[in-house]
Amino acid sequence: MLVTISGPPGSGKSTVASTLADHLSYEHISGGDIFRGLAEDRDLTLAEFNELAEEDPQIDKDLDRRLRETARGRDDIVLESRLAGWMAGEYADIKIWLDAPMSVRARRIAEREDKTPAAARAETEAREESETQRYEEYYAIDFDDITIYDLSVNTARWGPDAVTDIVLDAVDAYQAERDEGPTPIENVRYQF
């Protein structure tokens, strides 16, 4: 089974995906870890690398191609990134969307990255705007359209363990033979 976990920064994607993968004994593949690793390889901050990605479309496209190829060729994985649901597309068995209000996400990011909530919020808003524009430009993806997801969870309402339990319940209840087919993802340009 291929499960995707998507959502904006600070929504709890990595936490839930890691715990879910452990529970299922699946491999956890994180697009964010790959992206951060590429930034570190160049001795750039995440903000600096994101700016570079704005100028060099191939950075995003290489990462997204890897996600799509992973989804096409692998099983028993939890694939986690902002675009995991979109890139996995028809190959995903279950696509999960996690979200929380910006104030909650900014606080989480501030705690994780040892910065003020105001700084985290400003950086996150700029990053989201930049990435949303790039997704539209490169792939014709409307990032605000969450209808491609099978389950959406507001992670501000429950703690990480409870969110993981909600997702596990959905995964456990999934029966491929009763599935009416993959959620159609139309008009996306998978050109890398």
Swiss-Prot record:
Protein name: Cytidylate kinase
UniProt-annotated location(s): Cytoplasm
A Pfam family matched in the record: Cytidylate_kin2
Disulphide bridges: none
GO cellular component, one term: cytoplasm
DNA repair found in the keyword field: no
UniProt organism field: Halobacterium salinarum (strain ATCC 700922 / JCM 11081 / NRC-1)
Residues that coordinate or bind ATP: 7-15
EC number(s) reported in the record: 2.7.4.25
